[in-house]
């Protein structure tokens, strides 16, 4: 969310939410580094992000999440529609775990945002949680 920190750390890129800095201003600061945009459950927001040259799109929440309060509910249909309008990578977020990730991958999600599953998992240590995400 922090373009200035991205530049200071010489990071590969950053992710911008709808209430963060706009992508045009971010590009002026970090140039051609990766910028991803939150699109919630909206193909309209995705189209705007693509016009502004986002490098990837993020949709969610696909499930209930303990990491953030769910304000927008995305669906497999949202993911399918997004894949029809772009070849850019799609990140899926929101309550993703070892019981529900495969359906998202089968529907062509490129990346899984799984911080809550990894770091807040009450049953598994982080490495164990990640290992459980094997393609079955």
What are these regions, as identified by a protein language model?
Residues 10, 14, 33, 91-92, ...:
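Generic detector of intrinsically disordered, low-complexity, polar/charged segments
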């Amino acid at each position: 969310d922090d373009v200035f920190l991205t530049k200071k750390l010489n990071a590969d890129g950053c992710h911008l939410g709808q209430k963060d800095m706009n992508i045009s201003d971010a590009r002026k600061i970090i140039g051609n580094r990766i910028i991803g945009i939150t699109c919630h459950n909206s193909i309209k927001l995705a189209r705007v992000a693509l016009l502004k040259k986002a490098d990837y799109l993020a949709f969610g929440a696909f499930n209930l999440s303990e990491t953030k309060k769910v304000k927008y509910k995305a669906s497999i249909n949202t993911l399918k529609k997004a894949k029809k309008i772009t070849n850019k990578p799609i990140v899926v977020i929101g309550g993703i775990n070892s019981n529900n990730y495969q359906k998202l991958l089968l529907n062509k999600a490129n990346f899984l945002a799984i911080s809550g599953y990894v770091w807040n998992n009450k049953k598994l240590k982080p490495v164990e949680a990640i290992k459980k995400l094997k393609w079955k």
